Design a protein with these regions (language model features):
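A short, charge-rich alpha-helical start-of-domain segment used by transcription regulators
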Residues: 1-18, 31
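Acidic, proline/glycine-rich intrinsically disordered inter-domain spacer in sigma factors
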Residues: 76, 82-105
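Arg/Lys-rich amphipathic alpha helix in sigma70-family domain 2
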Residues: 47-49, 60-79, 93
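Short amphipathic alpha helix immediately N-terminal
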Residues: 107-126, 130
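DNA-recognition helix of helix-turn-helix
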Residues: 131-155
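Hydrophobic positions on the alpha-helical face of helix-turn-helix-like DNA-binding modules
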Residues: 37, 61, 114-115, 127-128, ...
């Protein structure tokens, strides 16, 4: 069981990295959150029944752990633009993508979860299952989040 768990975690480490980087703003918090996610995943692995894909289950564990971590820290998500890591070291990264990344980082944690899943290609039905809401609620929330992001990116682009 341990070997299979470690293999699946290794295969889906990108999910963990993505959640950690979007929910923790400094190195210490990233390490703490990564450790907490791995611990929670291991603790609940025995209850994983293969009714969904492992990646779907892992997303749910990661997001739930990140939300609890965020609540425990009782910090508001603030973004210091000078400390934001660019999406790439490549100077050709499109400015709009950077603005979107910054806007996503500024969303409340629950909304951030929904848009991350959407950007990763999950359907509304899968998002609803992972987050624990109805499919219609997921669609409505996603529409509102997209509008919020569009407004934030547009406002920031106009400021520059």
């Amino acid at each position: 069981m341990k070997t299979r768990f470690l293999e699946q975690i290794e295969e889906h480490t990108g999910i963990i990295n993505k959640i950690v980087n979007l929910y923790a703003d400094n190195t210490d918090d990233r390490q703490d959150l990564r450790q907490e996610i791995l611990l929670q995943a291991w603790r609940s692995y025995a209850s994983f029944e293969n009714r969904s894909k492992f990646s779907t289950w892992l997303y749910r564990v990661c997001l739930n752990t990140a939300l609890v971590f965020h609540r425990k820290s009782k910090r508001m998500v603030t973004v210091d633009i000078d400390n934001i890591k660019p999406l790439s070291n490549n100077n050709e990264v499109h400015h709009g993508a950077e603005l979107l990344y910054l806007a996503v980082k500024q969303l409340p944690p629950a909304e951030r979860s929904i848009i991350i899943l959407h950007l990763d290609g999950y359907a509304n039905e899968e998002i609803a299952e992972i987050i624990g809401i109805s499919k219609n609620n997921a669609a409505v929330k996603l529409h509102r989040i997209k509008q919020t992001l569009t407004d934030k990116v547009r406002n920031e682009a106009n400021r520059v």
